[in-house]
Regions:
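Acidic, metal-coordinating catalytic segment for phosphate/diphosphate chemistry
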Residues: 1-33
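Conserved hydrophobic "DFG−1" position in protein kinase catalytic cores
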Residues: 6, 36, 44, 109-110, ...
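A sequence-level detector of short linear motifs
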Residues: 13-16, 44, 148
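Conserved Nudix-box catalytic region and its N-terminal flanking loop in Nudix hydrolases
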Residues: 21-32, 37-77, 81
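A short coil-to-beta-strand element that immediately follows conserved catalytic motifs
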Residues: 86-95
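Nudix hydrolase/Nudix homology domain
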Residues: 99-165
Length: 165
């Protein structure tokens, strides 16, 4: 299990370092959601059927920020681990954040052309990937094919996209 830095709700770092998942009241870790956008389509990933939480459902890339790591570094590490992608700083845009029960989630957008044959899935995390339009993803949400906690992250992404189009 990885260690994480602990923050208060205002994102001020506390002196504590804990094992992920072992947070006390009013303690938060940082997580990243990484949306991969190629032109007007999203690359999404299907969670491994071996996952304890939401097996087989679809979501964006991402994960927890480990102790000593920045949110941006976590974006690069998670996309490398889960999908075998080397993401460059200039391809990454910070969109915003929101707070859940035990973590603060940073939302990031990576815009580039992805080659499916260059993507290497981390089997224990990711079962499959696919490229979908926003309309197709909305339909997947409606059909409950997507991790149910994704809405705040996805809504921030859509708001950002609407501003830049």
């Amino acid at each position: 299990m990885e260690n994480v830095d602990i923050f208060n709700k205002r994102r001020e770092k506390l002196e504590n370092i804990r094992e992920r998942g072992k947070l006390e009241k009013n303690e938060y870790s940082i997580s990243v959601h990484v949306w991969l956008l190629e032109e007007d389509k999203l690359w999404i990933q299907q969670r491994s059927n071996e996952k304890k939480i939401f097996p087989g459902l679809w979501e964006q890339s991402g994960g927890g920020v480990i102790s000593g790591e920045t949110s941006l570094e976590a974006v690069k590490r998670e996309t490398k681990e889960e999908l075998g992608l080397d993401i460059q700083d200039e391809e990454i845009t910070y969109i915003g954040s929101y707070t859940r029960v035990t973590d603060i989630v940073d939302i990031w957008l990576v815009q580039r052309i992805f080659s499916k044959d260059k993507i290497i899935l981390q089997d224990e995390e990711v079962a499959n990937i696919k490229n979908v339009t926003f309309e197709e993803f909305d339909k997947m949400i409606e059909n409950k094919e997507v991790v149910p906690t994704i809405n705040p992250s996805y809504n921030l992404l859509k708001e950002y996209i609407e501003k830049i189009v």
